[in-house]
Amino acid sequence: MRKSAKAFRKTLRDQGAFYTPDALAMKMRAQLPEHVAEVYDPTCGDGGLLRIFGDDVRKYGVEIDGAEAEKARSIPNSTIFSGDTLATDYFQNMQFDTIIANPPFGIPWAHPTQQPDENKAKHASEIFDNYPTYAPANCADWAFIAHILHKLSDNGTAVCLMGLGALYRGRAEAKIREYLVGRGVFSRIELIRDAQFEDTSIHVAMLTMRKSSQDKSILFVDGEVERRVEYSEIKENGFDLSVNRYVNAEKQEDKWKDLDPYAHEEMIRAMVCEHLDKSITTSKAMCEFDPLLNPIDDFLDSLQAVINKHRASESSPDNQTTTEDCL
């Protein structure tokens, strides 16, 4: 039976993708002005990020999960809607001086060419006005950013968490990054190592943004190391906004140089297994959400075929190797 978007998002949330830990929420708050009159969170969940602001601050939010939106409505001085923030502008003719967000990473969205509802397609088109292209349909990361910038006032500040892949992936996302860097949108990008979500620890990026600026340089931050990078260098790197491309490169190089090759190989294998486990969990949720996708068993059978192929080659007498041969 087809499951709802609510059930799908709950599955992802159970992976630790949506609840922002208090320490990280306060780190995000530190990038915003000290005195805030109002704040908007376009993917507010149960209102965790909105709760870090005082009762005197007007709070606005949208959340696709009705039950979570109901929890957020208990926040003093708040106006919360339940719905899809990328499909409907719930605060029409309003822009905000302060926006804070931790949108879900890497989820699909219905961009204008795929949105059957004319009004929803109109809003999705508006948030990408003047952009060179839309965010890809299978990944809404930059659609959330476009929405945030669309709702940000001319002198406002926004801070948002983002998965690292969005900083370097190519094609449409690279074109969007080029456009936004050219507008001077990003003032600061920080790598948050091992961000502690509910039941997982992942690296994320924290983006501090403005509507636009003549200053196209970006401050890249990794822990205590930071460096301001000019537009020309970012352009030379194909508008790759990965923090480690610009700061801490020598430290990273030394780290790998001194690492025991056997330990390195074991670490890589563990990372592959961890990533595969998370990918399968997400793929299963996608299959439950959209019955048009091929069954998860087909994917698992394909993985098993790859494993069997390598097991067979290793057991062949002609392919017996020593440990040294593998490393």
Locations of the language-model features?
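Short alpha-helix boundary/capping motifs
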Residues: R2, F18, D22, V62, ...
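A conserved structural/catalytic subdomain of Rossmann-like adenosyl-cofactor enzymes
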Residues: N93, D97-L327
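Conserved S-adenosyl-L-methionine
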Residues: F8-A101, G106-P108, D117, N155, ...
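Long recognition/docking surfaces used for binding and targeting
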Residues: M1-F8
